[in-house]
Amino acid sequence: MTLSPEDLKTIEKYALQNAVKYEKAPQSKAVMGKVMGECPQLRANPGAVSTALKSIVSEIAKGNPEAWKTRLSEIAPELIEALNVKKEPEKGLKPLEGAEPGKVVMRFAPNPNGPGTLGSARGMVVNSEYVKMYKGKFVLRFDDTDPDIKRPMLEAYDWYLDDFKWLGVVPDRVVYASDHFPIYYDYARKLIEMGKAYVCFCKGEDFKRLKDAKQACPHRDTSPEENLMHWEKMLAGEYEDQQAVLRIKTDIEHKDPALRDWGAFRIRKMSHPRAEIGNKYVVWPLLDFAGAIEDHELGMTHIIRGKDLIDSEKRQGYIYKYFGWTYPKTTHWGRVKIHEFGKFSTSSLRKAIEAGEYSGWDDPRLPTIRAIRRRGIQAEALKKFMIEMGVGMTDVSISMESLYAENRKIVDPVANRYFFVWAPVELEIAGMEPTVAKLPLHPTDHSRGVREIAVGNKVLVCAEDVEKLELGSVIRLKDFCNIEITSLSPLQAKHSDVSLEALKKAKAKIVHWAPVDGISVKVRGPEGDLEGIGEKGIVGELDKIVQFERFGFCRIDAVSEEKVVAYFAHK
């Protein structure tokens, strides 16, 4: 088959595009792949294409980047344009592999050793959104079978349910893994009977030494009958803490030590915080075993988990293989690093709270869902923030500013405006008669009306504004009046006749202010607390988001006749 002039031109344009893109002679292998991918009709004669490509590449290599670009613009200007288009990273949720509408079953499985964090919020949002996308079933499963290292908190169960309610998600099922010990025990017996599990009495350090050397422990070849006897003794509490471990028999010579005869059950004579469980059990399933059984029993079709849990999937794969089950389709995603919080864990946060470093799980300095809710972050903003991260193996590094930007879109149109003055300094205005200032509740939505502030001859302004004032300068008290500074210490001023238009043209300083008889305001935020004075009208905004002008958006958390407590959301 002889290549047509059009075929040769096609090869040339893709070779030129490669040269222009990388500013060097075209790479034959890459160009060949491109040509074959874009031109199915040429796949029948790869030899002729390869020969022609070799000649064309040799000729192009004699030129320079400017000549390549000129020639490419002559024969295929659209390819020049394609090189100039910056490809945006994919955002949002990609289709799930093998997902069928109405048949998808997914779960979010937290350990309730504390409330949901921004880390767990990703799983809460993405799993529930996929289920919604495919009209499937969503399971909230509490993986609460660790009585020791990650001991459950009773309050955390309700906190997760409350967070899901806030997100607008109603799980189709709520499951407590700690209710299913009898099921786990039954499957353990079956594995023992099959010769796929055994009771190991090695000390931890001894087993590790053997495992690392790819050597079987002395108990590995114990008969199923004897293993069943030891298993029943474990359940009866006849062995001491950590005296015996039930192990899944895998490949003791596997190249990955983490997959060699991994532990499935251990003895811990401890109580469970749930009253229904209490001291009922002394043999506790480890997470890889319990999770494998749960995912099968609950009919999971798809799992999304961190790439750090790839080994868990491999360990669980042995159980699925032994029972002839099909493992759910699994997607792994990378870690998320939020700049403002760095690395954190629920366990470390719990210790810090118990040590008194934080006021509680909703302390505004913490990366918990409870904390950001209290600050005024809206559920829809968090959902969009998490969805736009997408699902991929690449680690994600992101700033809270992205979440704040989404939240700002939601709260800015609805938040009433008020003045809050921190570190207040008294400003006396000579000749000012008592009056009532009328200020807009919202700068663009005038249907909201105005807020009225009774003003005498004194107001409060921020100390940081005072530091920037100069004697004789004319400034505007926002939405009120123009004044001229006559003294810096004490701070005094007089009314100015300079027009508002002239002040705007001169870009004069605009200062927000508060009445001297305003209400005491405490703002709690990620950077610490601020005290000051605000308008009395703030007391009518309990549990609402407001904007303290020139300060930021805040949620009004508590009010009394003497004081307002607000939580800072963001600028």
Curated annotation (Swiss-Prot):
Q: Which GO terms describe its molecular function?
A: ATP binding; glutamate-tRNA ligase activity
Name the UniProt key words of this record, in alphabetical order.
Aminoacyl-tRNA synthetase, ATP-binding, Cytoplasm, Ligase, Nucleotide-binding, Protein biosynthesis
EC numbers, comma separated = 6.1.1.17
Q: Which Pfam families match?
A: tRNA-synt_1c (PF00749), tRNA-synt_1c_C (PF03950)
A GO cellular component annotated for this chain's UniProt record is: cytosol
Q: Which reaction does it catalyse?
A: tRNA(Glu) + L-glutamate + ATP = L-glutamyl-tRNA(Glu) + AMP + diphosphate
Which one GO biological process term can you cite for this protein?
Answer: glutamyl-tRNA aminoacylation
Does the keyword ATP-binding belong to this entry? yes
Q: Which domain of life is it from?
A: Archaea
Which family does the similarity line name? Answer: Belongs to the class-I aminoacyl-tRNA synthetase family. Glutamate--tRNA ligase type 2 subfamily.
NCBIfam families assigned to the protein according to its UniProt record, in alphabetical order: gltX_arch (TIGR00463), PRK04156.1 (NF003169)
Q: What HAMAP family does its record include?
A: Glu_tRNA_synth_type2
Its biological purpose = Catalyzes the attachment of glutamate to tRNA(Glu) in a two-step reaction: glutamate is first activated by ATP to form Glu-AMP and then transferred to the acceptor end of tRNA(Glu).
Protein known as: Glutamate--tRNA ligase
Q: Which organism is it from?
A: Methanosarcina acetivorans (strain ATCC 35395 / DSM 2834 / JCM 12185 / C2A)
Starting at the broadest rank, the lineage of the source organism is: Archaea, Methanobacteriati, Methanobacteriota, Stenosarchaea group, Methanomicrobia
| Gene it is expressed from | gltX
